[in-house]
Amino acid sequence: MLQLTTYRNLQVFLVIMTAIGMSFALFFLQRYMGFSPCPLCIFQRIGLMIMGGFALIAALFHPKSMVIRLLLWLGSLAGIGWAAIVAGRHVWLQHLPADQVPSCGPGLDYWLDTLPMQQVLKEVFAGSGECASIEWTFLGLSIPEQSLILFSILILTHLLILWRIVRPSTPKPLAR
């Protein structure tokens, strides 16, 4: 019988979710709807791509070593954990009272060209007016709220993968 929760199948699931998430963001939200991603959205995409990259390596090479599997899992978890933290911050900014929303800044490109990386991170997480605006909702949820739900599901998937790494399925002996 086919097991859906094998190590390799779970890694392929993560790769597929990355492809769907990135395609939705690029083709639907950016190209079709015409939304430009704010700095926090870009950072969420980077985290999703990091997770997808590690999951792709794990799915393609299917390492047998528990150490290699754990390292790939840790890299993948770091990527999606980063994305979830950024999405959480984004949701928080969207729920601030209007008088507490930070003003719009010059933009991520300008910051990357003129500021050291530590200052860029500080500016991005401080947020800006564009990060606090809600451009589109689906089922009453903003894009960052939907992203946070997706990232939470992917973190739960990582816990299932960890379970598969530390306790791999062993074939049951045939009954006599």
UniProtKB/Swiss-Prot annotation:
Residues 29-46, 89-145 are periplasmic. Pfam families: DsbB (PF02600). One of its GO terms (molecular function) is electron transfer activity. The chain crosses the membrane at residues 12-28, 47-63, 71-88, 146-164. Keywords: Cell inner membrane, Cell membrane, Chaperone, Disulfide bond, Electron transport, Membrane, Oxidoreductase, Redox-active center, Transmembrane, Transmembrane helix, Transport. Its main location: membrane. It is found in: Cell inner membrane. It comes from the Bacteria. Gene3D superfamilies: DsbB-like. The keyword tRNA processing does not apply. SUPFAM superfamilies: DsbB-like. GO terms for cellular component: plasma membrane. One of its GO terms (biological process) is protein folding. It is a multi-pass membrane protein. Residues 1-11, 64-70, 165-176 are cytoplasmic. Belongs to the DsbB family. This is Disulfide bond formation protein B.
